[in-house]
Design a protein with these regions (language model features):
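Short, polar/flexible loop-turn hinges at active-site or ligand-entry regions and domain interfaces
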Residues: 1-2
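Long, positively charged amphipathic alpha-helical accessory segments at protein N-termini or as interdomain linkers
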Residues: 6-30, 41-183
Length: 183
């Protein structure tokens, strides 16, 4: 069960490592992770990750890991909050990239325990210690400072009043909001 809670975070770590290790990818800014499921390039969204669990009853279960990665030109309307990578990946190189991502994900999951997962993920999150809007379910927004990740891959924050609380579902906006879009 712990693997399921951490899968999205570990997929982010694996994707970041894969991009950095791919010679055909040219980066012009720093890569970082944004809790719970985004990869940022220079503070703008480069990729999103979604994991879906499928229960197969008696035969077990499987998880589908979906990754949306911006490659090539972006529409003008999204350039303030989205990023893209320049790369030259032909179809066989794309297959190699996907294989490398899968291998990195298996390595991340196999690498150990909760402490190792938390350390790997937290070392790549750029917003710790920086106040930003936290969007909660039901359209509630509060200003808080992300502090850490707990054992369940949830975000631990501190309110302006000093209260420590855990966010299990929500979205951070570490960069300025563009009308109608979370960063």
């Amino acid at each position: 069960e712990a693997e399921m809670q951490w899968l999205t975070a570990l997929a982010g770590v694996a994707l970041l490592r894969t991009i950095k290790a791919t010679p055909a990818v040219r980066l012009d800014s720093e890569l970082s992770l944004k809790w719970p499921n985004d990869l940022l390039l220079g503070g703008r969204k480069l990729a999103g990750i979604l994991c879906e669990h499928v229960d197969l009853a008696a035969s077990g279960h499987l998880v589908i890991v979906g990754v949306g990665l911006n490659i090539g030109a972006l529409p003008e309307a999204v350039k303030d909050f989205a990023a893209t990578i320049e790369c030259s990946l032909d179809s066989s190189s794309r297959e190699d990239f996907i294989d490398a991502f899968r291998g990195n994900l298996v390595d991340c999951i196999s690498a150990g325990d909760l402490a190792a997962w938390r350390e790997s993920y937290a070392s790549l999150v750029a917003v710790f210690g920086r106040e930003c809007p936290v969007h909660l379910p039901g359209k509630a927004v509060l200003s808080a400072t992300p502090l850490s990740i707990d054992d369940h891959a949830h975000l631990v924050c501190q309110s302006r009043e000093g209260e420590i609380f855990t966010v299990t579902t929500g979205e951070l906006s570490p960069t300025p909001l563009v009308e109608g879009h979370l960063s």
